[in-house]
């Protein structure tokens, strides 16, 4: 709930989170969203002015070191995808109930087998709007490495127990 974020966080912290969430709060799942800096400034100012009933303003103490980065596709999925898509890929993560559109069901082999791997990569890298899907699906291209995104694609194939369409796998 960001309705009173200015009561809980300093304007500087809010700005840093909007500009570079991963370095501001190591371990956060909030991705760095591609947008012009002028928009980042507007979002930061808007949030910094959102006051509620009052409260303590505090910034978290950064950890002494960065948390270890998840290595496997499963670990990456658990950290970055499961909050919306669910731990088993059924579109039933804890955040799903708050979204206007149900997250894609990654365990649905009929649906997922129609999606080539490069399309899955593009959706993770660029966000849902790239695929004409929900704009609520954030872009992770500035948060995850290419190798991590490919590890996620491979894990999606494990969840659905399927492969992409033949035409996308036969090298044509």
PLM regions: where:
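Cys/His-rich metal-chelating microdomains
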Residues: 87-88
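Electrostatic cytochrome c docking/interface patches
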Residues: 49-76, 166-172
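Contiguous, function-dense segments enriched for cysteine-driven chemistry
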Residues: 103, 145-146, 164-172
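Extracytoplasmic electron-transfer domains, predominantly the class I c-type cytochrome c fold
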Residues: 1-48, 98-157
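Short Cys/His-rich "knuckle" micro-motifs
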Residues: 92-94
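Short cysteine clusters
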Residues: 81-84
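Short amphipathic alpha-helical segments
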Residues: 96-97, 165
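Conserved short C-terminal alpha-helix that flanks the catalytic cleft of nucleotide-sugar-dependent
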Residues: 76-77, 140
